[in-house]
A protein has these predicted regions:
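Cytoplasmic helix-loop-helix junction between adjacent transmembrane helices
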Residues: 97-135
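Extracytoplasmic gate region of multi-pass secondary transporters
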Residues: 202-241
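Helix-loop-helix hairpin linking two adjacent transmembrane segments in secondary transporters
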Residues: 93, 122-124, 130-176
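Short hydrophobic/alpha-helical segments at membrane-entry points of transmembrane helices
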Residues: 92-98, 203-204
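Extracytoplasmic
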Residues: 7-37, 218-223
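Conserved MFS/SLC helix-loop-helix module at the cytosolic interface between two early adjacent transmembrane helices
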Residues: 53-92
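Short hydrophobic/small-residue motifs within alpha-helical transmembrane segments
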Residues: 47-49, 137-138, 245
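Juxtamembrane intracellular "pre-TM" segments in multi-pass secondary transporters
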Residues: 177-205
Length: 245
């Protein structure tokens, strides 16, 4: 498989880690910023809100931009947002950083999939996209537990600092490995929105919404639940997160 796919996989690993790692760091963040666990949990909501807002805007508003330039620019937004989170002096700045870092989420996955599929022959496109998204799966298995452990042992700011560094590494990797790719001149907002006329698209969206919604009701507060209900230590919580993921 082309090396560019591994650059994209590194990006999905970084994005997946920053999306979910907050759930394991809620007690640490709440204690450090002197806010309640429920209020801290809104940092997860803020990220999700940024994804919902950013995905269509970033995707539809950038169809005219060279795809290599776009992917690197999206990772720059990611680095900025996580950098703000790492150095946030208060809750408001941390929330702002979370929202900023989430704006590129959907666009990176969407554009990355198109770019990844275009790197290989048609018969290998499914495998190429799977390789790219393997970074997301690995982020849940390794990135989130490791980020939780680092955050609980050395401070949650370090976790976001390292995630920001991963984003920077991804941007550099893409800049050297990926060739310029012209945007689709036939693609436009009207053409992109036409997909919403399909009932199956809405069914898929509903399935995702209700399925993940049910999971995240509990998953968002899994660390404080385990900490208060079972008395588990930070290391034990990290192990539980690894097993669950």
């Amino acid at each position: 498989m082309p090396i560019q796919l591994y650059a994209l996989a590194l990006g999905t690993f970084a994005v997946g880690t920053t999306e979910f790692v907050m759930m394991g760091l809620l007690p640490s963040v709440a204690s450090d910023l002197a806010v309640s666990i429920p209020v801290t949990g809104l940092l997860v909501t803020g990220y999700a809100l940024g994804v919902v807002i950013g995905a269509p805007i970033m995707t539809l508003g950038t169809t005219h931009i060279d795809r290599k330039t776009l992917l690197i620019s999206l990772m720059a937004v990611f680095v900025l947002g996580n950098g703000l989170a790492a150095f946030a002096p208060n809750y408001a700045v941390l929330m702002f950083g979370r929202i900023i870092s989430s704006l590129m989420h959907g666009a990176f996955f969407g554009v990355g999939s198109v770019v990844g599929a275009g790197l290989v022959p048609k018969e290998k496109q499914a495998r190429a996209i799977a390789l790219m998204f393997s970074g997301l799966a690995i982020s849940n298995i390794i990135g989130v537990p490791l980020g939780t452990y680092i955050g609980q042992m050395f401070g949650w700011r370090l976790s976001f600092g390292l995630i920001s560094a991963l984003g920077l590494l991804t941007a550099l990797f893409l800049s050297f490995a990926l060739k310029p790719q012209a945007a689709d001149p036939l693609s436009g907002i009207k053409q992109e929105l036409a997909v919403l006329k399909r009932a199956r698209v809405w069914l898929a969206l509903a399935t995702t919404t209700f399925g993940f919604g049910g999971v995240f009701v509990v998953w968002t507060y899994i660390a404080p639940i385990l900490e208060t209900a079972t008395g588990l230590t930070p290391i034990a919580i990290t192990i539980v997160l690894f097993i669950i993921n």
